[in-house]
Amino acid sequence: LVDFDSKYGHRNDVMGYAKCLEELDAFVPEMVSALKPGDFLVFTADHGGDPSDESTDHTREYVPMVAAGPGVWAGADVGSRKTFADVGATVAEHLAVPSLGGTSFLGAILRD
């Protein structure tokens, strides 16, 4: 799960990158089914990227973020965030620990 961007994305290996994404997609239902009430899972990355771009540098894409689990709204839209710290603030609020910055969007993704 961790290395497919450096092995395929930054190497412009579109087919290898696609294969790894398909493997991850196949594993998601197993991860989600292991969640208990009150849990949620956040999928994200440190940057967006287009493995078909000629450059091996980061490209223009936004950072992806998907949340899943019991009590999470399917298709919740948190819009474009100004900082990645918002993900940390959201997780911190859910865990009831102090946030180091950012603005939580927990209320936008959890059902009542």
Task: Give the location of each predicted region.
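Feature captures the catalytic ectodomains and active-site-proximal regions of enzymes
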Residues: 1-112
